[in-house]
């Protein structure tokens, strides 16, 4: 997934089933990458601040399988949806120099074999806004802005593959106020939303 914010390109890179590689800040899998639009490296990326050992283009680590990414026109934050393993899908924010914890954390899910991965969350790692256990196979995300459903402005609309649903999440200060299923199972797996 790609997002442009303030002349920077943010790129997601899944961990491709390699697990702990998402904790390796010298490799791209399991990370969020941030570069300038001309392909050069921003001099305010984490490597040039307090993460001296990180690759210069890495902005955040510890994601498993990012599915959607969207820039909010309301708070200028980048929001992300991510597949867990067997459970542990989540919706959260992209944050400078932080770590979502895959595969130290399991976000509430388990390995496909049924064995435990790790805790849902623990201090020192980025906490998601919303987790789904069991997995709904989150996919695309957008932050709604428009006149058709004015009361939805600022809410996240998230699609689902496995659950075949469109969900609306009202949230504030990184906390869910409510989640509503707009529809489910009507049109099959939903990959994208605009």
Predicted features along the sequence, with ranges:
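Beta-propeller domain segments
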Residues: 15-180, 188
């Amino acid at each position: 997934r790609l997002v442009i914010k303030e002349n920077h390109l943010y790129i997601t890179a899944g961990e491709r089933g390699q697990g702990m590689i998402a904790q390796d800040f010298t490799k791209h899998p399991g990370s969020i990458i941030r570069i300038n639009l001309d392909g050069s490296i921003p001099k305010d990326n984490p490597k040039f601040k307090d993460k001296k050992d990180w690759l210069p283009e890495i902005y955040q680590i510890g994601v498993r399988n990012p599915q959607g990414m969207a820039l909010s026109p309301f708070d200028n934050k980048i929001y992300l949806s991510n597949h867990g393993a067997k459970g542990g899908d989540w919706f959260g924010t992209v944050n400078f120099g932080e770590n979502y914890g895959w595969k130290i954390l399991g976000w509430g899910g388990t390995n496909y074999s049924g064995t435990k991965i790790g805790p849902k969350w623990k201090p020192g790692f980025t906490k998601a806004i919303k987790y789904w256990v069991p997995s709904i196979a989150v996919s695309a995300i957008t932050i709604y802005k428009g006149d058709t459903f004015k009361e939805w402005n600022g809410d996240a609309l998230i699609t689902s593959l496995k659950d075949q649903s469109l969900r609306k999440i009202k949230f504030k200060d990184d906390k869910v106020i409510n989640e509503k299923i707009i529809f489910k199972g009507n049109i099959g797996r939903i990959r994208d939303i605009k």
